[in-house]
Amino acid sequence: TDWISFHNRSSMSSAGVTMIAERCDDSYWEKNYDGYTLEVLKKLPPAKKRIIFINIDGSHYTYIARVPVNLRDKLGISKEDPYHDYDLTIAYDDQVMKDIFEYAKANLNLKSMIYFSDHGENMKHYHTTSPFYYDMVHIPFFVYLSPDYQAAHPELMPALKSHEQQVFTNDLAFDTVTGIWQAKTNFYQSQYDFSSKDYAINMDNATTFERKKKIKDDPVWQGK
């Protein structure tokens, strides 16, 4: 198991994540742009089986500082975009994810890839507990399963596709990831696993922010 992180290893906000990371076989703490992930992947020693966790820096403020200077004018983001700096980080990390995916498929015998954010962002208040805005919990989420992994676990892809339009929050990451990877524990609950036919989260019962906020109250879902 390998952990690759572009966050501060010793900050208070990263303490919990650091404790988990240090339990991996190897951990790599990088002070570089997210695109450097490829260089770290290329240095990993050969292994028959491997799980790699990658904790990229993403779209944290100050946004412009997250993107290499030589790429800032090459990512297709208009200078007239009112959220130029933030959107630049999105475009940059889209490219980073593409590069990681293509490298892993070509060189690491990629069986599955799961990506999600820990939070979204409000352009005025960033991400915080007070005040709370729903765009702070809008996150990207995607799952890739290789053809042979799908063949070995034929129940996964139909379940994932059937839930494509349903609610997912990263509170459900534990059950979903362990379900996809067939690493279920005594704590696993299939009703919270997005890849299970038993998935039971919907607009009526989905919550976020320590169950204090109902997803159905999000203005996006209400068409506002």
Residue ranges and their predicted role:
Residues 1-73, 169-170, 175-200:
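Active-site-proximal alpha/beta segments of enzymes that process anionic O-linked groups
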Residues 21, 136-138:
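Short, solvent-exposed loop/turn segments at the edges of secondary structure
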Residues 58, 131, 139:
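Active-site neighborhoods of enzymes that stabilize oxyanions during catalysis
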Residues 60-61, 119, 125-130:
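Histidine-centered active-site/metal-ligand motif
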Residues 102-107, 123, 130-132, 147-224:
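Membrane-interface soluble catalytic domains
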